[in-house]
A protein has these predicted regions:
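Jelly-roll (double-stranded beta-helix
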Residues: 1-342
Length: 342
């Protein structure tokens, strides 16, 4: 909660406290932030049995012993599920994600890598959190961002999966400040979605920054295109002075795009996310994993998923993980293997 009066002031249009699922604006449709302190893994890369017994396995969203299993029943994470009509960006700052999909792609990424999945049409994948450390703990810090696709790009057959390795990511660093440029431009650094079907390109002024500030560190970004929706998230830390106002962490701020965002951090290390982009501005219908143009299209898509979800899945299990010693890689269905640069 900020130290504001009842109404936000100055460049702040709206403020709200944050939860695991963040408030978003067009073109962003959903953001989830998962932080879990998993224990050492067993031979299955799963938590010890005594720490998962008694849970509502398959839908465990309550932290017990410091972690959640989510939809996983053995390994934490999200077994086979559909995406339809949007693009997903996943950044595990700590921890690993094992990814397998309906097209036969599989891989492991983590510790600063960024995965882009564009799913204009019916697409299925699983995202599991393997506990690869069998002696120490396996903490996870995973942020997932979903960006809508415009109506003209929905229901196209070409989905895509790409991993941008941590070693290839653009960073901007000054004393006390480290900015990871996930999408867009910042101080001469730039990167855009590698997907064919995307809204996250230069022409739509999409920018996604992850900002780490040391105690007393400073960050600044100038005014944006007046058309964009601009949102700042104070994810961890204690206090900071943002555009002249003192706020405390766990705060979402919708900000006037014409303002310069300047942050002076307090006495603890802090993490902020900045999400901005030109809104698509089209009426859409969403239910569960589907974002299409009309309610009827969504109903038809749900029926397709019910009839086809297991027929399209090429793997033996719906919660697939890779071997414990796999390292970070992306193995495409055509046999092409991609790994981080040496």
């Amino acid at each position: 909660m900020a130290f504001f009066s009842r109404k936000p002031k100055g460049p702040f249009i709206k403020t709200s406290e944050m939860t695991m699922h963040w408030d978003t604006e067009d073109p962003f449709i959903f953001v989830s932030h998962h932080e879990d302190d998993y224990p050492h893994g067993n031979a299955q890369m799963a938590p010890p049995l005594q720490e998962i017994s008694g849970r509502n396995l398959g839908r465990d969203y309550k932290k017990t012993f410091g972690f959640r299993m989510y939809n996983g029943k053995v390994v934490p994470g999200f077994p086979m599920h559909a995406h339809w009509g949007y693009e997903t960006i996943t950044l595990p700052q700590t921890g690993y994600v094992d990814h397998s999909d309906c097209e036969g792609n599989t891989g492991r990424f983590g510790f600063g890598d960024v995965q882009w999945v564009s799913a204009p049409g019916f697409y299925e994948h699983c995202e599991m959190y393997p506990l690869v450390d069998q002696e120490g703990r396996n903490p996870n810090d995973i942020t997932q961002i979903m960006i809508a696709l415009p109506l003209e790009k929905k229901n196209l057959p070409e989905s895509s999966v790409n991993t941008v390795w941590k070693e290839e990511m653009p960073y901007f660093e000054t004393e006390g400040c480290r900015v990871q440029v996930i999408c867009g431009e910042y101080n001469g650094k730039s990167v855009w979605s590698p997907s064919t079907h995307t809204w996250a390109d230069k022409s739509h002024s999409v920018r996604i920054l992850r900002v780490e500030l040391d105690p007393s560190g400073k960050f600044e970004v100038g005014p944006a295109d007046p058309k964009v929706n601009r949102n700042l998230y104070f994810v961890s830390g204690d206090k900071a002075r943002i555009m002249g106002f003192e706020v405390i962490w766990n705060l979402h701020m919708k900000i006037d795009p014409g303002a310069t965002v300047d942050i002076e951090n307090g006495s603890e290390k802090s993490v902020f996310w900045l999400l901005e982009g030109e809104p698509i501005g089209q009426k859409m219908s969403m239910f569960g994993p589907i974002l299409l143009g009309t309610d009827q299209e969504v109903r038809d898509a749900l029926q397709t998923i019910r009839l086809e979800e297991f027929k399209r899945w090429p793997w033996d299990v719906i919660d697939r993980v890779n071997p414990i010693d796999s390292g970070r890689f992306l193995l495409r269905s055509d046999g092409t293997r991609e790994t981080p640069p040496e």
